[in-house]
């Protein structure tokens, strides 16, 4: 039986035996990268504003406060998207929710490109943020639910990498269009990729886990057969595992009220996201051309290509981190990352305070900036998202991850909405020293509060968590 969308079907034993003899390319290697387009758009939305902002400020004669809201409106929308994404996903499924986010991406990007005032642009950026918030919450869940166990980590890590690639792509677009001065083309450049995501989602499979949660087991089996190269044994085993896990799942908010350790793990996830944002990394991502100008790079084109170099280094560093996090561990990467980021922020703060009077001192400031973004991409950027999922029990994971995701976007908004004002009121040097102090504080918090989950199964983490073991000890 085929559904109208053509995405699922009921499979007879004869179908299974015939299809198992057919050699096929694993469909997961097609589905995964298409779903990761959501991460690419997420990254583009973060990165594209850095090159467009100086041109927008000139076109609309925008004050520092207006510029801050042009940047940070996206985060407010993303917080709303993260909240509503869970309801949409439960009601309509992961695939349809990603399709909806793609439509909102298209509308938001076109609206930004056609904005006739700074206030209209702020509104359109908020609409784009809703799409970012929905996709940032749903895409990793969708990927985890369609992936085979052996490649689940790689596909989810690939999603995180696609965010960094999206940032790099945005920086390249900004640099290429900087000569024309067309900020409208910069902001509208996301629309074609978002359109591809919308069209592609019509052809991708529905999450088998969601289908089973709606008591559509036959359709779930059909999807699993497609995803597992028609291996009926693997598909049936996975179907049974999903059925068992669904019996365990409960109401996350009810568990939050009743279980003190789950409340603590939820607050720890929220703290981790706060720490990630208040490293000051997104200050670099959003205002990179301005910071490079403060460091002594004079021309706009040079600043744009300097920003591209930052994007390249971040993408490479993230690739290294996601390939090594299971070998090195979570806490060592965070210790090193926060220490290096704190030292870099402190060094830049001192240099900006005493003044960059020579080419040598300007070069040191740029080197510190580069070291900072590499450290961030190899530590807090990927590790925090991994930990936020690992430290939550299965029957409260949706609730816990949703809370931490909203915290990420609210913290992101605060950072983006205050940076230019801080430069004006406190001065450049003091602002960077403030972020340095926060990074050094985060080292202490990692030591006191975080578990090391390297090599520990999710089942063991959950068993310790739900039995009341102190959070710091639920890992190794």
Where are these predicted regions, by residue range?
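Alpha-helical transmembrane bundle of multi-pass membrane proteins
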Residues: 2-218, 223-225, 244-476
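Short, structured interface segments
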Residues: 236-246
């Amino acid at each position: 039986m085929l559904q109208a969308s053509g995405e699922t079907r009921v499979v007879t034993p004869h179908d299974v035996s015939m299809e198992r003899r057919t050699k096929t390319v694993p469909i997961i290697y097609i589905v995964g990268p298409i779903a990761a387009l959501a991460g690419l758009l997420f990254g583009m939305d973060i990165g594209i504003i850095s090159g467009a902002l100086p041109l927008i400020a000139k076109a609309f004669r925008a004050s520092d406060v207006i510029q801050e809201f042009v940047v940070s409106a996206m985060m407010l929308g993303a917080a709303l998207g993260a909240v509503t994404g869970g309801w949409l996903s439960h009601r309509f499924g992961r695939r349809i929710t990603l399709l909806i986010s793609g439509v909102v991406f298209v509308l938001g990007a076109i609206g930004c490109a056609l904005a006739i005032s700074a206030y209209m642009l702020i509104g359109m950026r908020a609409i784009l943020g809703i799409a970012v918030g929905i996709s940032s919450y749903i895409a990793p869940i969708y990927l985890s639910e369609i992936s085979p166990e052996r490649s689940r980590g790689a596909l989810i890590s690939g999603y995180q990498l696609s965010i960094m690639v999206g940032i790099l792509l945005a920086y390249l677009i900004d640099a290429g269009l900087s000569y024309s001065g067309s900020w409208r083309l910069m902001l509208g450049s996301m629309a074609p990729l978002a359109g591809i995501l919308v069209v592609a989602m019509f052809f991708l499979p529905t999450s088998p886990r969601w289908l089973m949660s709606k008591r559509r087991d036959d359709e779930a089996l059909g999807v699993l057969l497609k995803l597992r190269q028609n291996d009926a044994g693997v598909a049936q085993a996975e179907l049974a595992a999903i059925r068992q896990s669904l019996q365990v799942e409960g109401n996350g908010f009810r568990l939050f009220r009743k279980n003190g350790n789950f409340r603590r793990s939820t607050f720890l996830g929220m703290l981790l996201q706060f720490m990630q944002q208040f490293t000051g990394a997104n200050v670099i991502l959003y205002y990179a051309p301005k910071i490079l100008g403060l460091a002594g790079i004079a021309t706009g084109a040079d600043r744009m290509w300097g920003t591209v170099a930052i994007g390249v280094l971040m993408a490479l560093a993230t690739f290294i981190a996601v390939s090594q996090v299971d070998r090195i561990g979570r806490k060592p990467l965070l210790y090193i990352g926060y220490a290096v980021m704190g030292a870099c922020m402190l060094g830049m703060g001192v240099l900006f305070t005493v003044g960059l009077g020579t080419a040598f001192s300007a070069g040191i400031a740029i080197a510190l900036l580069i070291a900072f973004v590499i450290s961030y991409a190899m530590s807090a950027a990927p590790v925090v998202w991994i930990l936020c999922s690992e430290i939550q029990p299965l029957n409260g994971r949706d609730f816990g991850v949703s809370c931490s995701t909203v915290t990420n976007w609210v913290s992101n908004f605060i950072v983006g909405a205050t940076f230019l004002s801080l430069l004006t009121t406190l001065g450049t040097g003091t602002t960077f020293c403030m972020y340095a102090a926060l990074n050094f504080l985060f080292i202490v918090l990692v030591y006191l509060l975080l578990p090391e989950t390297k090599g520990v199964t999710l089942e063991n983490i959950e068993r310790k968590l739900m039995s009341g073991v102190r959070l710091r000890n639920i890992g190794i």
